[in-house]
């Protein structure tokens, strides 16, 4: 799924931050480019469509949820609208995740990546190292945040499957 792929990319970015926080300067330009690529891959995944519908935009399904500017500042264009399916008498289930939920609800993944890029490109080695190291905890928290959203989505899927099976048995 797109959230699983985003999770793997954030994990990769966190590992780069850990590796680069040692203060070695010669690999920083390459690492900065790797983080820029990860940023753009996450942006592309966050803008995933199912048919003609952006899946992380809330109710704004015809709008790409995220854009970025040249300075790696991301803007969210979706909303926090829930999509719900009625599964029984007075029972409905939320069946979507928004980009805000997945990527900005606690830690703003895009801001953390931008700050990591800034640290990797900082001409002052000590300041750059401090900024890189400062992104390790936000990256760890972002991983927890994404895992929680993935777990919620998996739980919803299981609940929908259970309801479907119950309805199929009821019809027999």
Write out the residue ranges for each language-model feature.
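Cysteine-poor, low-complexity segments in flexible/peripheral regions
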Residues: 64-125
């Amino acid at each position: 799924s797109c959230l699983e792929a985003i999770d793997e990319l954030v994990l990769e970015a966190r590992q780069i931050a850990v590796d680069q926080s040692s203060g070695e300067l010669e690999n920083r330009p390459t690492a900065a480019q790797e983080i820029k690529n990860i940023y753009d891959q996450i942006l592309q995944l966050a803008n995933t469509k199912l048919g003609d519908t952006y899946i992380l935009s809330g109710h704004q399904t015809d709008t790409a949820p995220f854009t970025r500017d040249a300075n790696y500042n991301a803007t969210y264009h979706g909303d926090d609208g829930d999509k719900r399916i009625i599964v029984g008498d007075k029972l409905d289930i939320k069946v979507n995740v928004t980009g805000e939920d997945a990527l900005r609800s606690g830690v703003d993944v895009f801001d953390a990546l931008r700050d990591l890029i800034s640290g990797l490109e900082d001409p002052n080695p000590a300041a750059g190292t401090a900024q890189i190291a400062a992104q390790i905890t936000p990256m760890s928290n972002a991983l927890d945040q994404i895992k929680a959203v993935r777990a919620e989505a998996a739980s919803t899927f299981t609940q929908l499957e259970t309801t479907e099976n119950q309805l199929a048995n009821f019809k027999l």
